[in-house]
């Protein structure tokens, strides 16, 4: 489940996990960045202290990729091998979703990494590939209003035009990788969940047919 802050992504993940468990499936929920990197010095500097000058943008993106690789190999793959379903709150394009809206200085590094860097694409090929990926998006003003209402969200300056630029970057990558686009601007959480569940049900039917 990919998407920028303010699109309802985490809430949708919770509903999907709950629905799958109610159907009797064993479900593992993961999120990117993981708690491991959230406790790191770099993450604390950028997200909690709002200090970007001491953090090299490329080093930060490499750390994010290492976090994804560790999660993929040590958590996701073993869970799938055990027949469990894994639902990820951000995964492949987590940098676009969680970093750029807070740290615009990372734009050049992340944009280059996602569009033309051989090292990035080579590392991505080592990640467990999702059976289905969703990219949630919303009108910038609506998303920023949602962000402002989150009690646990550290205040940070968010420019609507920059948010739109980041969204367009994420959307282009999502389209190129055949992700399912879900617009959450004027749609209820119940309806968004129902749409997502249609795709998930198809995947589960295909998986059952293969076995």
Annotate each language-model stretch with its function.
Residues 1:
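Hydrophobic anchor at the beta1->P-loop junction of P-loop NTPases
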Residues 25-115:
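ATP-dependent small-molecule kinase phosphotransfer cores
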Residues 10:
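Walker A/P-loop
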Residues 28-30, 87, 132-134, 180-182:
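Hydrophobic/aromatic beta-strand patches that form the interior of the parallel beta-sheet core
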Residues 94-168:
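A glycine- and Lys/Arg-enriched "phosphate-lid" helix/loop adjacent to the NTP-binding pocket
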Residues 6-7:
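ATP-binding Walker
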């Amino acid at each position: 489940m990919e998407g920028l802050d303010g699109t309802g992504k985490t809430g949708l993940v919770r509903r999907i996990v709950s629905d799958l468990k109610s159907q009797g499936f064993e479900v593992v929920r993961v999120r990117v960045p993981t708690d491991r990197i959230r406790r790191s010095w770099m993450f604390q500097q950028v997200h909690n202290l709002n200090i970007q000058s001491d953090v090299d943008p490329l080093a930060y993106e490499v750390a994010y990729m290492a976090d994804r690789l560790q999660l993929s190999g040590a958590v996701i793959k073993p869970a799938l091998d055990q027949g469990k379903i894994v639902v990820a709150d951000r995964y492949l394009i987590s940098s676009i979703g969680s970093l750029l809206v807070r740290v615009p200085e990372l734009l050049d590094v992340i944009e280059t990494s996602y569009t033309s860097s051989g090292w990035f694409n080579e590392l991505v090929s080592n990640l467990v590939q999702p059976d289905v990926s969703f990219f949630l998006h919303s009108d910038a003003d609506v998303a920023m209003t949602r962000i402002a209402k989150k009690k646990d969200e550290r205040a940070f300056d968010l420019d609507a035009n920059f948010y739109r630029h980041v969204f367009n970057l994420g959307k282009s990558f999502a389209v190129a990788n055949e992700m399912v686009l879900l617009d959450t601007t004027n749609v209820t959480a119940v309806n968004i969940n129902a749409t997502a569940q249609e795709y998930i049900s198809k995947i589960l039917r295909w998986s059952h047919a293969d076995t």
